[in-house]
Amino acid sequence: MIEIKNVTYSYLDIIALNNINLEIKPGEAVALMGANGCGKSTLLKLINGIISPERGSYRFDGEEITHKKLQDNKFSKQLHQRIGFVFQNSDTQLFCSSVFEEIAFGPRQMGLDELEVTKRVKDCLKLLNIENFESRIPYHLSGGEKRKVAIACVMSLNPDVLVLDEPMNGLDPKTQRWLVEFLVKLNKAGKTLIISTHNLELVHEISTRAILFNEEHTIVADMSTKELLKDINLLKKVNLVDEYYH
């Protein structure tokens, strides 16, 4: 499904991804792990088609994703319909006057008729158990409530792949537990999950495979999540835990 070969990406002169090679198959639940600034968020943006490789190649379902193709509005919409992205800061993707309008925005951009748009909004409100949010202003919601609305917006397009950047950040324990259970259900239903996270307590519940980055912006490990969590020396080496971690 996702094939990344020898990909490098920089912000001006600062390298964010350094010769990345990675394959992700349909239905996998993959965690991207590493210290802040190691390249996790940049890789998620590349997978979602927000940016394209400077060097190397990125293929989705066998088709190479290039800057030129992403400039084509039709191609870009089709890609974003299949790959949903939940940003770390929910405020960056919530900008409409009500939760209903927020969730309806994506389907309308895809050209769906209003009956289908309304059905999708209602289905997503029910799926996320936020039916009472329908007429509320997104700006007035709590952090956890905003995260649920952001996920509902993405789910309204019924993507094959769900990409989440630090989804546990800023959530209280109850909302974290809800999100873990929700993601597990999505994965069991066949959705491919790609999640960046620092949460060592919950990562084994939401992923079966872990990709570990070092501070040189390269991948240093690709193994089962449970195996990685047992390798404390490796986690210390990439500054994901400190010397007092047990």
Question: What do these predicted regions represent?
Answer:
Residues 115-133:
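Conserved ABC ATPase "signature" region
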Residues 48:
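Helix-to-loop junction immediately C-terminal to a conserved catalytic motif
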Residues 137-141, 145:
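Conserved ABC ATPase signature
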Residues 33-35:
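The feature captures the beta-strand-to-loop junction immediately N-terminal to the Walker
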Residues 217-239:
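Conserved beta-strand-loop-alpha-helix hinge in the C-terminal portion
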Residues 162-165:
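Catalytic Walker B motif of ABC-type/P-loop ATPase nucleotide-binding domains
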Residues 197-198:
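H-loop/switch region of ABC-family ATPase nucleotide-binding domains
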